Amino acid sequence: MSSYFVNSFCGRYPNGPDYQLHNYGDHSSVSEQFRDSASMHSGRYGYGYNGMDLSVGRSGSGHFGSGERARSYAAGASAAPAEPRYSQPATSTHSPPPDPLPCSAVAPSPGSDSHHGGKNSLGNSSGASANAGSTHISSREGVGTASAAEEDAPASSEQAGAQSEPSPAPPAQPQIYPWMRKLHISHDNIGGPEGKRARTAYTRYQTLELEKEFHFNRYLTRRRRIEIAHALCLSERQIKIWFQNRRMKWKKDNKLKSMSMAAAGGAFRP
C-alpha cells in the first residue's frame, strides 16, 4: 500500500500544479454521477479499476506529493485490460489526462526499500517501547522503595518517641495498718489442702464480746449466732467453734473447782 500511495501518479501527471481537479460530473442524477465517475476513472488510470477513487481533493502539492506517485504500476497499467463496464470514454466535462510516461525508466520501485524501512522503524519503535517500559518499571520500583522508606521512617520515629517518653510509674500501694488487716481468715494454703487448719486469732474486742455472750448464755441459737457473726465480722462456724471450746474450758474449770471443794469439805469433817 505504501508503494501505491507514493508512486501512483508520478508518470501520468508530470505537471501536478497545472492539473485541474475533477468534479464528479453532473449531480442531477445518481446514475449519471456513477457513470461519469466510472468512465473518468477507467479512462484516467488505464487499467482495471475496481471503483475506489483515491485522488479526490488532491492538489499539485498533495498530502503524499504528486511527483512521487505510482512508479511501479506502469507495467500493470499497460498490460491489464479494462473491464467492459469501465471501458467507456471520459465525459466532456473532464479534460483527458496526458499519456502516462514509463515510470520504469524514471526510477525503480522502492517497495523493497519501504518494506525494509518499515521493518527498521518497527524495530526502533519496539526498542524504544522496551526502553520506556524498563524505565517505567525502574521508576515504579524507585517510587515503591521510596514509599517504603517513608513508611519505615515514621514507624521508627514513633518507636523512638515511645522509648524516649518516660514510662508511667506504677501506682503506689496504699499503706495498710495492722488494724486494717483481716485476722480471722482461715489459712487453708499453709498446710496444704489436706493439712491442719490454722488457728483463728481473735482480737481483744471480739474476745470480750464473746465472753459477755457466754456469761449470759452458754448455748446459742442459730438466729443469735448469725447476729453475733455479723456484729463481730466473723463466720457462724467460727462463733460455733469458739463457744464449743469455751464450754469445754468451763466444764474443766468447774470440775476442778468441784473436786477441790469436795476435797476441802472432806478434810474438815469431824
Curated annotation (Swiss-Prot):
Among its keywords, does the record have Repeat? no
Give the GO biological process terms: anterior/posterior pattern specification; bronchiole development; cartilage morphogenesis; cell migration; cell-cell signaling involved in mammary gland development; embryonic skeletal system development; embryonic skeletal system morphogenesis; epithelial tube branching involved in lung morphogenesis
Q: Where is this motif: Antp-type hexapeptide?
A: 176-181
Task: Could you list this entry's UniProt keywords, alphabetically sorted.
Answer: Developmental protein, DNA-binding, Homeobox, Nucleus, Transcription, Transcription regulation
Please verify whether the record's keywords include Nucleus: yes
* Compositionally biased spans, kind Low complexity: 75-86, 119-134, 154-166
Location within or outside the cell = Nucleus
| Gene3D superfamilies recorded | Homeodomain-like
- Residue spans binding DNA: 195-254
Q: Region entry Disordered: which residue ranges?
A: 75-175
What Gene Ontology cellular-component terms does the record carry? nucleus
Molecular function in Gene Ontology? DNA binding; DNA-binding transcription activator activity, RNA polymerase II-specific; RNA polymerase II cis-regulatory region sequence-specific DNA binding
Looking at the record's lineage, which domain of life comes first?
Answer: Eukaryota
Q: Which PROSITE patterns match?
A: ANTENNAPEDIA, HOMEOBOX_1, HOMEOBOX_2
The record's family statement is:
Belongs to the Antp homeobox family.
| Quaternary structure note | Forms a DNA-binding heterodimer with transcription factor PBX1.
Q: Which purpose does this protein serve, as stated in its record? A: Sequence-specific transcription factor which is part of a developmental regulatory system that provides cells with specific positional identities on the anterior-posterior axis. Also binds to its own promoter. Binds specifically to the motif 5'-CYYNATTA[TG]Y-3'.
What is the name of the protein in this document?
Answer: Homeobox protein Hox-A5
Q: From what organism does this protein derive?
A: Mus musculus (Mouse)
**What does the record give as the organism's lineage?**
Eukaryota, Metazoa, Chordata, Craniata, Vertebrata
Q: Which gene encodes it?
A: Hoxa5
